[in-house]
């Protein structure tokens, strides 16, 4: 199976009203469709621009959590509409979502053209999220069985912990999505190196989509550095560098790349090396977190 994936280098804008957000998202999806994308990947915390719709709380960390979380059902309805309209799988920008017990989680949602929705919460919080922002990690870890293959999601920092993606790979994952939000180049490179390592270990693709640009009005996502990338194992039919395509640093844009899952199957069966098969031979390589397989076909 082969298709085009699009990874967003997405700017956090100050928006005057809901219609401005709707127009922005619709335009981005239309451009992805014009590029032939069957899968569009938005970044971590891209939804925080919705905090600007409430000027009274947009400058407050706690207040912005509540205001954005309240809009998530409306945001999700728009994504579902656009996924159906364009026949596209869309990973929405992650958003803070309130749980019944009062905690907030960082949640990514994967929409299919047929109307199915898969949810992956971030498991491991950064220092800012846990010490200043009050966002909690949340299990379970999942993969999603879709018409585009078996997809896993590691939100930003999660990609820096190899057992998560390894467990997803053993559950059948062929394509890892890595939405990110990093305020400095150090963070961007940590996530990029993590995503590339996960692609090498799991002999799979990794699609990395970051936020970019300045949003000085926001105390949460004021600085955003990064470049999108699609990473592969450095073996077989893939580039020697393991870098399929990379975007221009900090520039708002879509990055397009061709995904061929037949290459993943072939490499896992008969690659120059067999990282996927040989994982258990390393000392301590046996115990992995559980993974829930969700049918989105």
Report the location of each language-model feature.
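Cys-nucleophile CN-hydrolase/nitrilase-fold catalytic domain and related Cys-dependent amidase chemistry
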Residues: 18-113, 184-197, 201
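CN hydrolase (nitrilase-like) catalytic-core segments centered on the catalytic cysteine
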Residues: 69-71, 75-90, 160-252
């Amino acid at each position: 199976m082969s298709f085009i994936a699009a990874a967003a280098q997405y700017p956090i804008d100050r928006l005057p009203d809901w219609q401005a957000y709707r127009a922005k998202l619709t335009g981005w999806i239309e451009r992805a469709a014009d590029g032939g994308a069957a899968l569009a990947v938005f970044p971590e915390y891209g939804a925080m621009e919705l905090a600007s719709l409430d000027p009274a709380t947009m400058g407050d960390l706690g207040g912005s959590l509540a205001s954005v979380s309240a809009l998530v059902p409306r945001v999700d309805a728009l994504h579902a509409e656009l996924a159906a309209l364009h026949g596209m799988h869309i990973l929405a920008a992650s958003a803070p979502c309130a749980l019944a017990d009062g905690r907030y989680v960082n949640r990514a949602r994967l929409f299919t053209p047929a109307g199915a929705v898969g949810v992956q919460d971030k498991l491991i919080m950064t220092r800012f999220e846990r010490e200043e922002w009050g966002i909690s990690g949340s299990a379970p870890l999942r993969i999603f069985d879709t018409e585009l293959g078996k997809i896993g999601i590691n939100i930003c920092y999660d990609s820096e912990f190899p057992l998560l993606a390894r467990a997803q790979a053993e559950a059948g994952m062929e394509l890892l999505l890595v939405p990110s939000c990093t305020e400095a180049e150090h963070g961007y490179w940590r996530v990029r190196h993590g995503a590339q390592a996960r692609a090498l270990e799991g002999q799979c693709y990794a699609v990395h989509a970051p936020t970019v640009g300045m949003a000085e009005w926001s105390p949460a996502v004021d600085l955003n550095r990064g470049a999108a990338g699609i990473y592969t194992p450095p073996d077989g039919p893939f580039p020697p560098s393991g870098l399929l395509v990379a975007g221009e640093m900090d520039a708002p844009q879509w990055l397009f790349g061709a995904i061929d899952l037949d290459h993943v199957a072939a490499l896992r069966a008969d690659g120059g090396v067999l990282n996927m098969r040989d994982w258990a031979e390393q000392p301590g390589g046996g115990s992995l977190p559980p993974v829930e397989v969700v049918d989105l076909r």
